[in-house]
């Protein structure tokens, strides 16, 4: 029964969501946001690394999934997002976790059924799928969406008779 940690990276707010897979069921274990206060980017990256490391220690996930970088109009923002992703990925690889990456379109398609879904639709569907009493905050909902996308990919591979391993883009191990 694998535990999946999903991460929605950001240089100011990084969302995380943890689910456990039991057969075809997904069980909510936890979610939240790592908020950085400093204007100093290296300090923010350390907060992200330390936060993800602590979540890994707390939940002991078997799999790590993260949203892939999108092309932003602002190059500086894209670079900062890439660095935030890097801090989270290093925390996962330090814990010997396999890393899988998914595009925003793949995540929305897995959760809502369309890659053009709005954030509010993702929040609503995450709440429904995981039977939560209220919609999670946006960044946490996105991270839970990443974990759900990974779960659906994992389930699809099993259904096709393949090994229960997901193609990763650079195994980061």
Swiss-Prot record:
One of its GO terms (biological process) is DNA recombination. GO terms for cellular component: cytoplasm; Holliday junction resolvase complex. It comes from the Bacteria. Its cofactor is Mg(2+). SUPFAM superfamilies: Ribonuclease H-like. Mg(2+) 1 binds at residues 8, 139. This is Crossover junction endodeoxyribonuclease RuvC.
């Amino acid at each position: 029964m694998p535990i999946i940690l999903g991460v929605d990276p950001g240089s100011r707010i990084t969302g995380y969501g943890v689910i456990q897979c039991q057969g075809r069921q997904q069980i909510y274990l936890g979610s939240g946001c790592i908020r950085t206060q400093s204007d100093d980017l290296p300090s923010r990256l350390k907060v992200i690394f330390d936060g993800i490391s602590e979540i890994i220690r707390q939940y002991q996930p078997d799999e790590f999934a993260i949203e892939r970088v999108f092309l932003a109009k602002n190059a500086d923002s894209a670079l900062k997002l890439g660095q935030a992703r890097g801090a989270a990925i290093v925390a996962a690889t330090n814990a010997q976790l396999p890393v899988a990456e998914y595009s925003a379109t793949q995540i929305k398609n897995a959760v809502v059924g369309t890659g053009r879904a709005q954030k509010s639709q993702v929040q609503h569907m995450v709440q429904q799928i995981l039977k939560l009493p209220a919609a999670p905050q946006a960044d946490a909902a996105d991270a839970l969406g990443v974990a759900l996308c990974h779960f659906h990919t994992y389930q699809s591979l099993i259904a096709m008779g393949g090994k229960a391993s997901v193609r990763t883009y650079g195994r980061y191990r």
